[in-house]
């Protein structure tokens, strides 16, 4: 499969009045995403897309693969990092009424995958989201994609929630949302033109 960079941004926390950056996030979309998204969003401006939650939801639920890279700016242990991701995912799943036993079990598997991991600065986690609801996790000492995934989580709601918490209604990275809205219009207009001819 081939991917293109949809957008990138930073995630951090405000500690004692200062914004501390922890993670740089890159969202890569399978190349067929251009045709899929262009059908509805071609011709829209960056400003329109930024204000339209449905645009981000179409990225999250679209019938194409997504690859999300989270590269650490500051050192974090796997459990430290995953705890915050899980809190956000569970809060989202509960808010939309899709948190049941299967999701609790999937989140437990998610936690287990991160237990032995440590992220020094520059290390990365990769989330591969397939349209059939499988979330592949892999860990790298740098930004290169590992050949083997560390865990596979087969739960569509949990898989979607990971990206939802990054670019959805209560996004942890407004930067990333802005970048997607800024980059994608040109790709959609150009890509749709090529596909149509």
From Swiss-Prot:
It comes from Medicago sativa. Keywords: Flavonoid biosynthesis, Isomerase. Pfam families: Chalcone. One of its GO terms (molecular function) is chalcone isomerase activity. Substrate binds at residues 23, 88, 165. Pathway: Secondary metabolite biosynthesis; flavonoid biosynthesis. Belongs to the chalcone isomerase family. It catalyses: a chalcone = a flavanone. Its EC number is 5.5.1.6. Catalyzes the intramolecular cyclization of bicyclic chalcones into tricyclic (S)-flavanones. Responsible for the isomerization of 4,2',4',6'-tetrahydroxychalcone (also termed chalcone) into naringenin. This is Chalcone--flavanone isomerase 2. The record marks 81 as: Important for catalytic activity. The keyword Ribonucleoprotein does not apply. Part of the biosynthetic pathway for all classes of flavonoids, a large class of secondary plant metabolites, many of which are brightly colored. InterPro entries: CFI (IPR044164), Chalcone_isomerase (IPR016087), Chalcone_isomerase_3-sand (IPR016088), Chalcone_isomerase_bundle_sf (IPR016089), Chalcone_isomerase_sf (IPR036298). GO terms for biological process: flavonoid biosynthetic process.
């Amino acid at each position: 499969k081939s991917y293109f960079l949809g957008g990138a941004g930073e995630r951090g926390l405000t500690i004692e009045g200062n914004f501390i950056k922890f993670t740089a996030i890159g969202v890569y979309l399978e190349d067929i995403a251009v045709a899929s998204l262009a059908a509805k969003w071609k011709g829209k401006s960056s400003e329109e897309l930024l204000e339209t939650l449905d645009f981000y939801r179409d990225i999250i639920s679209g019938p194409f693969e997504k690859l999300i890279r989270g590269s650490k700016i500051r050192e974090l242990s796997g459990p430290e990092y995953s705890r915050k991701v899980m809190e956000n995912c569970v809060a989202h799943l509960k808010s939309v009424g899709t948190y049941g036993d299967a999701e609790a079990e999937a989140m437990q598997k998610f936690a287990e995958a991160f237990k032995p991991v440590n992220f020094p600065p520059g290390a990365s986690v990769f989330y591969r989201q397939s349209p059939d609801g499988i979330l592949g996790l892999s860990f790298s000492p740098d930004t290169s994609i590992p050949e083997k995934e560390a865990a596979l989580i087969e739960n569509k709601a949990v898989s979607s929630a990971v990206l939802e918490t990054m670019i959805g209604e209560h996004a942890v990275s407004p930067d990333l949302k802005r970048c997607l809205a800024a980059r994608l219009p040109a790709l959609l207009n150009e890509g749709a033109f090529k596909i149509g001819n």
